[in-house]
Amino acid sequence: MERQGMSEGNPLLAKISTLLTMFKLMYPDMNDLQEDILSKYLIELYEKFNINERTNVGKLKKTDFPIMRDLYDFLAEKKEKGEEEFTKISDFHTILYAYSEGLFAKILNGHTNVDITNPLCDFDILELQHKPKLQRVVYFLLLSHIQYEVVNGDKSESQLYIDEAHIIADPKVPLAMEYLYTAMKMLRSFNCGITPASQSIKDFLSARDDQRNYGEAVINQATQRFYLPMADTEVDFLEREMNMQFSEEEKTAITVVEGRKEEEAGKGLYFVGSKKIRLQVVLTDVEKQLWFDRKPFSEVII
């Protein structure tokens, strides 16, 4: 629950807004009233840690900020006092136990210990693939943390690759995918390029509200797009949902033929603006050893 607000505006309110999106991913049934009550409680909690709108968070240490357990205990105090407002978010308090003391506490209940001073950083959350609810929360936290680091950095050139980006697309919480859409627009002005990738177009386009489909918005604002082979039903879905028209030749290029997956790997349609070409990615010998042979880097023959 540390400093991840924007450098412009009010960092505390920006942080609380980010936290509310994360809490909605934990508790998708949260309504507007519950969100308002929780935001009020979060402001009180930060005040308890001597953090308010006037605080210069840049001078604080990581350990100066509250963690999940602090929020859980703070809400428990509200419960003990019999506050009527607490009864409106009692279900959320119950769910929060898993993240503060229970099953997921080792992952989320603590101060940030990530060091991204290395010029190449890889956040691996593969171990969470069978815990989709937790995976989505962690994915969003990583994205918000990286955005904070870029916005508050020195604007040196950087590149952010977001693999399996459909993970963040929750039909019940479109705000998470909207966050990615907003990040793509914002980070460009901080000299950061963003490349989202997904192998599930249906999931990627599942997050929408009354205003727009945020997965579609992410795709539409991309200056370059690369469509790799997919099932014919996914091609039809893409045409229908994105109002796209592929020629028969183009459909052939991006449709998986059963039994030929390895042969078609790396082939697809590459879009730059309104122009599109058939393209094939060819790996170098070193890349083949790393990717297909799964060799440790120390054993790679150069």
Language-model features, listed with the residues they occupy:
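P-loop NTPase motor domains
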Residues: 1-192, 260-263, 270-272
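Conserved ATP-driven motor cores of ASCE-family P-loop NTPases powering translocation/secretion/packaging/pilus
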Residues: 1-30, 172-282
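Short, solvent-exposed amphipathic alpha-helical segments in soluble enzyme
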Residues: 138-141, 242-244, 286
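Short, surface-exposed polybasic-aromatic patches that bind anionic ligands, especially phosphate groups
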Residues: 281-292
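Extended active-site and interfacial segments that coordinate phosphate-rich ligands
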Residues: 295-297
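Acidic, low-complexity intrinsically disordered tails
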Residues: 299-302
